[in-house]
Amino acid sequence: MPKGLKGKMVGREKKVIHPYSRKAAQITRESHKQDKKERLKTEKALRLNLIGDKLQWFHSHLDMKKTRYSKKDACELVERYLDRFSSELEQIELQNSIKDRQGRRHHSREAVIKQTLERERQQYEGYGFEIPDILDSNTLQTFREWDFDLKKLPNIKMRKLCADDAVPKKRKQKNILNIEKDLGELELSGPTGATTDGKLEPASESSDTDEEMTPVPVSPH
């Protein structure tokens, strides 16, 4: 290769890109795009691991005799899941209660556990806590056959359960009817007045307008 041509190629390789040039902007965009892609990939892997850990717990605590779960049984299983750290928290509290300890040990671990349980409890008592749909017999069978491969998670149908799901519909309806009945009785009882002995009794219906109603006397203190 001629020396002149070789020198030109070396110079071209060492050419510095201007920081405000279009080439520099393109390189910056590609770098940000790659960083975002890696971040999303990491976040997705983390979410899959968390979901996998949760599903492994439910898988290991399934009742092998059941072909499907009722809402009540599924809610009881969720309650057990929300109580899964109770033994560890007791051990941490016991260690912290021992005399001559300087500060609280395992504080970061304790804080993470409590934050996790608080978030899960809010979900369960709010818009719902997601678990495998073990109320469906086919999904339960698929879940039993799961080999803990995270790539197979899309094959497991999920559903949300709330704390209210533990109460049968008939009992809910009965409670609603009782409340409506009590409200109806209150409406039928009409307005009330005050008597000298402090007990309330129906007010007089002799007047029809507010102007004609007798003011309720204020009892002396």
From Swiss-Prot:
Protein's cellular compartments: Nucleus
Q: Which residues form a coiled coil?
A: none
Which InterPro entries does the UniProt record give?
A: Tma16, Tma16_sf
Give the UniProt keywords, A-Z: Nucleus, Ribosome biogenesis
Stretches for region Disordered: 180-221
Q: What is its main location?
A: nucleus
Gene Ontology cellular component?
A: nucleolus; nucleoplasm
- Gene Ontology molecular functions: preribosome binding
GO BP terms in the entry = ribosomal large subunit biogenesis
Query: Which protein family is it in?
Result: Belongs to the TMA16 family.
Q: How does it assemble?
A: Associates with pre-60S ribosomal particles.
User: Any idea what job this protein has?
Assistant: Involved in the biogenesis of the 60S ribosomal subunit in the nucleus.
Q: What name does the UniProt record give this protein?
A: Translation machinery-associated protein 16
Its taxonomic placement starts with: Eukaryota, Metazoa, Chordata, Craniata, Vertebrata
